Curated annotation (Swiss-Prot):
It catalyses: a ubiquinone + NADH + 5 H(+)(in) = a ubiquinol + NAD(+) + 4 H(+)(out). It comes from the Eukaryota. One of its GO terms (cellular component) is mitochondrial inner membrane. The chain crosses the membrane at residues 23-43, 60-80, 92-112, 113-133, 147-167, 194-214, 224-244, 257-277, 284-303, 308-330, 350-370, 393-413, 434-454. Its main location: mitochondrion. Core subunit of the mitochondrial membrane respiratory chain NADH dehydrogenase (Complex I) which catalyzes electron transfer from NADH through the respiratory chain, using ubiquinone as an electron acceptor. Essential for the catalytic activity and assembly of complex I. Its EC number is 7.1.1.2. Belongs to the complex I subunit 4 family. It comes from Rattus norvegicus. It is an enzyme of class 7 (translocase). InterPro entries: NADH4_N, NADH_Q_OxRdtase_chainM/4, NADH_UbQ_OxRdtase, ND/Mrp_TM. It is found in: Mitochondrion inner membrane. This is NADH-ubiquinone oxidoreductase chain 4. GO terms for biological process: aerobic respiration; cerebellum development; electron transport coupled proton transport; in utero embryonic development; mitochondrial electron transport, NADH to ubiquinone; mitochondrial respiratory chain complex I assembly; response to ethanol; response to hypoxia.
Amino acid sequence: MLKIIFPSIMLLPLTWLSANKKIWTNVTSYSFLVSLLSLSLLWQNDENYLNFSVMFSSDPLSTPLIILTTWLLPLMMLASQNHMKKENMMHQKLYISMLISLQILLIMTFSATELILFYILFEATLIPTLIIITRWGNQTERLNAGIYFLFYTLIGSIPLLIALISIQNSMGTLNFLILSLTTHPLPSTWSNTILWLACMMAFMIKMPLYGVHLWLPKAHVEAPIAGSMILAAILLKLGGYGMMRVSIILDPLTKSLAYPFIILSLWGMIMTSSICLRQTDLKSLIAYSSVSHMALVITAIMIQTPWSFMGATMLMIAHGLTSSLLFCLANTNYERIHSRTMIMARGLQMIFPLMATWWLLASLANLALPPLINLMGELFIVMATFSWSNPSIILMATNIVITGIYSMYMIITTQRGKLTSHMNNLQPSHTRELTLMALHIIPLMLLTINPKLITGLTM
């Protein structure tokens, strides 16, 4: 694990010691090398942990998320260059340092083997994200979004800390490797119900669950491009990862306590998909579609069958790449038109035909087109939910239809139609932008060939 963490830490001195002209090139190319290094984690057995030390190890659930984290840093560097070029060098270096420190914290979070260490790192990711949103966001509403993000996360996390200390006292350890071996079923008492809620709510707010999702659209809309990418691709997945890890300890309780949350997330899935249909703001639409997809993941994790866990892991990885791609595309529009309103950007297919191709591919990936891993993940979840409760197929089918409708609405509004009069001197697509889109789509295509890499814990 240190072979990934140490090179990531060394990106910080590279940022501050590089020549001003070379800074973006150096950091981008070096972070690509780090992401290639992380691929070595895939060469491991199906079931066992790769134990690197007492503190850090990886297994089939954390490995895909670590690789996704390292893959995203160079992509964020590519996406941010135009946004940051007006800032002075000091601010540019600070911005890059924030993204690097976020990557280091995320890699350590996903590879932590001890729950208190996981909790500390899980909370530490909040600080760089908050600074990125409140310092480099576009509008003044970014401060409001930052406050929402901070307080929602903190209110969920404080009960989690108390619950973890309580579990430490009763079990004597919080190490994943030992906890999975201890047979210590929690009896169904009031105090254990509160313990379960305290453990799960922190992760549900991070996912986010419908009802505690209000921070997400605000944070996404106000964040700069790199903030939106890392938030959609990785930080939401922290919630799902945490739920999968903690559910090992809370085993028999989840079966009875999961019902209201499964129902709420299924209902929320329909509601947020419907909200997407009446959005005028492009980033807001993508943010609400993220809530809808994450509701599927919450449902799958709560059902707790091998198929649903596989579906949840696959959908998390697929959604990470797809939503990040959609935010990049929205950003290319914003940099040219200086507005997120979809109706202002109509007819862009006439000017940017190649970018329209990426829009089409991204929309199709978002609505889970066969044979992409998005579809495999959703199919596993739909089948697991159907075997849990037959009537749930109605809600699932409705959601799939609405997802198709809002994906079409998004692409037709932004790409088709007559050009508006204010679009007279737009700069063409840069090679940097087209490369960025390709680097999102290619992993999605390649994972379709071998989805076994991201099926996660098959219990």
